[in-house]
Amino acid sequence: MMMEVKAIHKGARISAQKTRLVADQIRGLPIARALNILNFSPKKAAFIVKKVVESAVANAEHNKGADIDELKVSAIIVDKGTSLKRFTARAKGRGNQIEKQTCHISVTLSN
């Protein structure tokens, strides 16, 4: 019986481009291996993605009663979120706009 479990984190305060670098490393891997890679990755995105994967594992355990050892990351999608617009002061009384990027991380686990 094929089972799919999802976990979504919306509005993560990191750019989608940086998060996709981490997501590409764990796509298709078993849960134990994926969490091991995320634990030892120095990137900020790895910490955020790890939280989402752990949430998906908890969903599988609690909602579906799944065996964790059989699960793998079947899909991980990183979409661009809304940009927070901020201004920074420049010379001669001017200002420049800075966009603080956000992203939506969606993790799907299956057995």
UniProtKB/Swiss-Prot annotation:
Assigned GO CC terms: cytosolic large ribosomal subunit
GO MF, one annotated term: structural constituent of ribosome
Gene3D superfamilies: Ribosomal protein L22/L17
Keywords, in A-Z order: Ribonucleoprotein, Ribosomal protein, RNA-binding, rRNA-binding
One Gene Ontology term from the biological process aspect of the record: translation
Described purpose of this protein according to its UniProt entry: This protein binds specifically to 23S rRNA; its binding is stimulated by other ribosomal proteins, e.g. L4, L17, and L20. It is important during the early stages of 50S assembly. It makes multiple contacts with different domains of the 23S rRNA in the assembled 50S subunit and ribosome.
Quaternary structure (record): Part of the 50S ribosomal subunit.
Name of the protein described by the UniProt record: Large ribosomal subunit protein uL22
Species this chain originates from: Polynucleobacter necessarius subsp. necessarius (strain STIR1)
